């Protein structure tokens, strides 16, 4: 802001004096007039003596000025202020109960403003009054009405995203849905008269209670006639404002500027229809675009077979449907609107289907599918789909599986947009084909899947594709009948193994090869086996294997198209006919093959038989037919496959159904070609996979990347998998508030202030104790925690509110059981502490921790015969990393070598160490340097107590030698003493050294020869001072005094030597400070600070006492003095 400069200051100053005099005269006159008035009024001596100066004065000049109170709630009667409204109300009730009406403050419900009730009411009317929506309707040419612009205020729940435009409805939703545990503290029902009447007259007694007194508020005893009235009182009364503050914390307010309001149609316009008739006669149901339609057909044909169910998007959680029909077997979910050019979708309801009942499932149990995903693709879509719709996966409840499903009349082509339903099986019942089977790349030729063909339900393959839907070339031919568990259609993996036009190598199974029945693909099962020859012709580029299957498996003997892998199977005795459906309750256990090829399952074993390499297949369980009462599964042993010459076949005889499966002869053509995929993307993927090769570290064999993992699991982990199948691991959840997850494979203990490695994690957890999530109990053993969880908290599968409200999560399945998606740590405990079973621990941090995801730990029992179990290290020295078998040897080592002994901190209740001489407990970071400094200054310690920490007497010429654990180690990266920059004097290194915590690792130093590689770099720098070298005699010549006679002396004598040295040479060099610190086992910073402190004392004494010096001394010595001298001449 510009200001005009002031001129004529002299004249203005002269005028000021006159103005001041005039004002003084005016004030004096006014005071005289007031004095005359006061003399005329005399209240008396009583009031004069009872009046103090503070009653008439405006402010006290001698008192301190009251500071501005920055907190929002300030008391006007005193100096109190606070940030919380409840604290302010408590203050008023305690100290100003009489004047509470003057200072009562209430908050604004819509903002942070708080004041007296009248002021808040005026504030609310001014700033938060609801805008009256005045709708000015204008009539256009068509006669339709348009509403004016209006701003809609909506409220949203932050926990479940529920939204509403009414604030009261929003508060009611939050209270009922998310704070339901608070309802019991407010809702009360008067039952005095009910207790006096007998049980048969309960309804009469309730009627006798007057309506206003039936319900009451437990907080303020307000009466209400109904639950809604009581709810309105709780949510709107000013008495329960604290409850509103809780509810408002999870409510978000949004102002939507909608412009012109959308038109509301009383009758919807005609839209695309979705019909689900029973037999083609049911009328189609009208639908609006923003709705989903669920067609629920019946098993029995009836006019009302299709019952439409409409789910509106506008009302979340609401479901309106017509009366459901009984005996529903499946559900069809269709997305609306349909593609362009299609007006309806017709689905024929299935006939009563035979179901396969697993063991323990009732015979008449109906299929009850859960909610289905909408338009979920089966596999990767390589090309544009056009107007066709991908199939939907139907989920079937475990234990019930329909075996046949008619596709409907498909002799004629169906228009685009047909939505077939391909039911898949829930994991645990049957294993469906992995994604990638249905690849939208080529159209299905005509004539595939004629009318009336039966396809097994649950087989998620192109066998259930209706013409018009795109699929791969591997589709079942005309008239082919496939039973589930025999062959998934579309298995075209051989084209991804070999490049185009290249013959299969010798690793492909040759003719006459013997394959045990258990060595099939991981998801393929064979009931029993017999031997049949190959009599099927193979087209160009087709790999064909002849797999004989007996007893309970339907044959597949149809010709296949290019790119399809087919197993030609013949039927032996006790085999169901082709057209015979499986009866409910039959004892066949059918599964699916994987979508990968047989060639992918060939795993080289690295061994040869007669010069021919052998291969293995992934092991799989074999199902044997048993009586209808149950199912039996036998795990076959893993056996290699021998490549025999072509034509060499071993005769086989049919085996009994109950006997184990004998080997199966698998014959193949002598020259087998594999046709590659025509698409460039598949070719690039094959070439990319072929470039990735890995070497097995066990057998030194080279494998492709897609075979290496399977080889490791099969060839080198078979014994471990066998042992793991015996007992199911136990899954537990616990709390460890003393741990902090730092990074991968590393955690930090907040109590001990140290890092804990993977090997010591479980011992550290048990040392501090694992806390129960549901109660304050703490356990120091796994067995105690397991028994406590089974006995006290059996059935509790949800986290407590303290954890769930803060965002802690545990992975659980549908039944509430713990899931372990990965393992962060794998540790070992002895069997006597753990038991026979493995234990999976999901460990959560404390309630106030920032890490919300648990750490998953697997604890395995240590076998008695495992190497290293007899010589297990019980304890490890945290200073020199020496292993000790017994606790006595460990404590003796600490006592003799480090002059400490383990103890427990009396306040922190954490492991600590104490001095054996003075019994003082070490606090902070424990290092050898801290022990050495304490021993030097400890009055109870003997003078030669630090001899164990000193190096052996001798002469070290090389400055690159480092002393670690009493042995001389050569390391060029470390120096004898820490080299410090100018001016730092070791403070920075000391700070860094103290920040580095010790690492507890039992396997850190198995021997003395590995000590230098294990000790951290910062610790070596810290301990280099305590493990100092022996200094040369030549280096001592630079010192002003000889320190040899003070070695091994007490701390006071060494301090006296430093004083003498200061009087001799008050300004030592850096080299002298380094030598003095290494000789007296003290820090260089301590030596430098000692000399600096003495110099400061001398300079202060010179300044205060002013010493004088007579002439006649050596003037050349003045050059060595660095402080100024004042020469005073005295005549």
UniProtKB/Swiss-Prot annotation:
GO terms for cellular component: chromatin; nucleus. One of its GO terms (biological process) is nervous system development. The modification Phosphoserine is found at residue 1024. GO terms for molecular function: DNA binding; DNA-binding transcription factor activity, RNA polymerase II-specific; zinc ion binding. There is a cross-link at residue 1032 (Glycyl lysine isopeptide (Lys-Gly) (interchain with G-Cter in SUMO1)). Residues 1043-1102 bind DNA. There is a cross-link at residues 118, 146, 979, 1018, 1032 (Glycyl lysine isopeptide (Lys-Gly) (interchain with G-Cter in SUMO2)). It comes from the Eukaryota. Residues 274-329 are annotated as: Disordered. May interact with SMARCA4/BRG1. May be involved in transcriptional regulation. May play a role in neuronal function; perhaps involved in protection of brain tissues from oxidative stress. May be involved in erythroid differentiation. This is Activity-dependent neuroprotector homeobox protein 2. The gene is ADNP2.
